[in-house]
């Protein structure tokens, strides 16, 4: 905590500017961003309207099918965003993100506030996703289910997590041998 992970994601998404350094994204990269506070949601709208207003070419049936995949069925789709729990807002944000044409998803703590079933939906959606995904998470189970590569931010530098594990194993081994 406090190492700048969220700030880095915001820089990559151009929400904030970097103090120094540069980065370049490919010319065809379209970013989809998921933040912990769900700033993309409009509190005064219903779940259904939140999707239909952003994706007006979708039919009512298509919208209901997408929302059902994120556990919103029947009259639930007409609940106002402001009345939803954190986990429910997370599911709406994820539904919007998966509908976007983004080919690079940036997710900040995507499993926060999600129940087990919602986490499984997210895991399946990410595992089926064909683009690039960069996320910050402390949820070890989620990481194990979805990550193909793990980086650790140590002293403002990314380190391959496999190397971090090996270093820790060597340290523990030395401690055990010295006893």
Residue ranges and their predicted role:
Residues 1-171, 179:
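ABC ATP-binding cassette signature C-motif
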């Amino acid at each position: 905590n406090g190492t700048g992970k969220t700030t880095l994601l915001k820089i990559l998404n151009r929400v904030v500017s970097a103090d120094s350094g540069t980065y370049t994204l490919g010319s065809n990269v379209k970013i989809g961003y998921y933040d912990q506070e769900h700033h993309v949601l409009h509190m005064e709208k219903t779940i259904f309207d939140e999707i239909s207003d952003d994706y007006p070419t979708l039919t009512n049936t298509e919208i209901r099918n997408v929302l059902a995949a994120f556990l919103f069925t029947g009259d639930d789709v007409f609940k106002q965003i402001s009345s939803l729990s954190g986990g429910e807002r997370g599911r709406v944000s994820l539904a919007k993100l998966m509908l976007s044409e983004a080919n690079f998803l940036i997710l900040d703590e995507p499993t926060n506030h999600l129940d087990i079933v919602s986490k499984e939906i997210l895991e399946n959606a990410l595992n089926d996703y064909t683009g690039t995904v960069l996320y910050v998470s402390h949820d070890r189970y989620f990481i194990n289910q979805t990550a193909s590569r793990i980086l650790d931010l140590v002293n403002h530098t990314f380190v391959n997590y496999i190397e971090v594990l090996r270093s820790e194993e060597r340290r523990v081994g030395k401690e055990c041998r010295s006893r």
